[in-house]
């Protein structure tokens, strides 16, 4: 077993490179995104929004066993030292928007959802539980089924779309609270990435209900950036302290 910044070997990519290139940054997908987001200290947390979502929190060099429905995992190893994370995965987040578009035919593109959510009646209390394939962390209920509640005669397309966006933020919030309870740490900022983070309504609602700053980077491929950072540190191109400061 090697550290994440170890030199694993070299490659020419089957002749693509004229000289062998060292392989010296190896990380899992979400773990690389955590590193790419600069979550290098205990208490720092990132959320990747995609078809499903992954939330990961750096907890430092001592593992913590969760009692609130998330799992403990390795973050990375550097110089013989291992950092750990709490991790929670959600089955249905961005996929809810696909359901609105492909199955319900309420929208023709994901971009429409922000405007519709802003048009929705703020007094409407429609809620969506997106348990189309059960519920993942922190609920772990494989038998749960999806439901929509609170519909009234005045509930329309905009209100249903808003409920779909809201349910993404509610699930992320439940994971944030679970991790705060497990660690006793107060999370100040949520660093986010993934396609749905371009939705201004969703990101503002996420910030409101978690009462956290939501930091949206300009870059989109945080996993690739994290792996590149790790390789660069191993090769002496990057300095970890400077990366952490930025």
List each language-model region with its residue ranges.
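Active-site core segments that coordinate phosphate-bearing ligands/cofactors
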Residues: 11-246
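Active-site-proximal segments of catalytic enzyme domains
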Residues: 6
